[in-house]
């Protein structure tokens, strides 16, 4: 549903919509993580057809990387914080595959979810550096009723882990609301609120 929201937005703003479905091996620094990453190609194609996607590009790793990958991008601090701090090389892998996809498809616009905000920033930087005439469109996060952001990886979470992830989002959201509506004198009560999570 999260990815389909990107297709829906793209359909409204473009004559032709092309979607890529590819689990990119070079953005995983942990082989076990790559191995367990959810893959449902038949379901993906069915959902994309239902959403009205005009073409699906589903290459193999051999087609995308027939030769040894030697490209390297340096995004500076942008790739060394948050997710990049614990996944070295991840954003270089993202940049390489996105560059290849852009050069194959040559889109006018490309749609990415704001859920992966750091990735979105990396891709915007890549487009600027490479001077691609592509508009990068960030699309809002789609959430489950519980508030948990939709993700293919959610199926890997136990019920308890899902509840914890949901509570993290609730705590962040409520802390922002609290900060925006309360004054400094009331901040002591925030500790009570925080301890509840």
Predicted regions and their residues:
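Nucleotidyltransferase catalytic core that binds NTPs
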Residues: 1-197
């Amino acid at each position: 549903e999260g990815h389909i929201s990107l297709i829906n937005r793209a359909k409204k703003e473009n004559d032709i919509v092309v979607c890529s479905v590819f689990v990119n091996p070079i953005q995983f620094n942990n082989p076990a993580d790559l191995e367990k990453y959810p893959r449902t190609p038949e379901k993906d194609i069915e959902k994309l057809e239902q959403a009205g996607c005009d073409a699906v590009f589903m290459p193999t790793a051999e087609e995308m990387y027939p030769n040894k990958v030697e490209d390297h991008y340096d995004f500076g601090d942008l790739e060394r914080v948050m997710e990049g701090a614990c996944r070295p090389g991840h954003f270089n892998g993202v940049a390489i595959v996105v560059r290849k996809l852009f050069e194959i498809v040559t889109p006018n616009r490309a749609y990415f979810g704001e859920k992966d905000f750091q990735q979105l920033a990396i891709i915007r930087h890549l487009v600027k550096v490479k001077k691609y005439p592509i508009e990068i469109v960030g699309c809002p996060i789609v959430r489950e009723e519980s508030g948990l952001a939709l993700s293919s990886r959610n199926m890997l979470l136990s019920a308890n882990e899902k509840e914890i992830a949901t509570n993290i989002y609730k705590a962040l959201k409520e802390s922002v609301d609290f900060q925006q509506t309360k004054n400094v004198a009331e901040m002591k009560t925030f500790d009570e609120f925080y301890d509840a999570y």
